[in-house]
Amino acid sequence: LFRSPYTDSPEDIEAARSIYFGFDQPLDNWTWNVAWFNDPVFLGEYPKEGLEKYKEYLPVITKEDMELIHQPLDFMGQNIYNGYWIRAGKDGKPEYVDRTEGFPKTATNWPVTPECLYWGVRFLYERYHLPMYITENGMACHDQIAADGRVHDSNRIDFLDKYIYC
């Protein structure tokens, strides 16, 4: 899941970036770590913080492994749906910002967070320096067939407007 700064302040931007590429998730939720899966492919090495955190679970990673994993690529594709707001706390450490009651959600209770489309692409480009393609985005909603036999889809139209114009 993506991390977006709560405000445009340099402190919040850096807090969001550090959480996005950092290793704040518990070991049983490691699959959502962006740097762990992308750094070897695009930068040619696993993040040191991840190597330390996962060391007892990892096989030996050889130079030959890294040569195979790290190949020249023309672009990066990323699925981007939603994310969390992050701000710099009073102590300077990143902290998650709670969503307000009534925050918009999809039919599957995913939060509608269009700013993650901007910040996700920005953070990924700044780190990996490759053209970005959004390979997947969208929402689940309860489609209703109107009396005219059509699905007017106002929820999805609103969702796409928010994400396209973020």
Please give the residue ranges for each predicted region.
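Active-site region of glycoside hydrolase catalytic domains
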Residues: 2-166
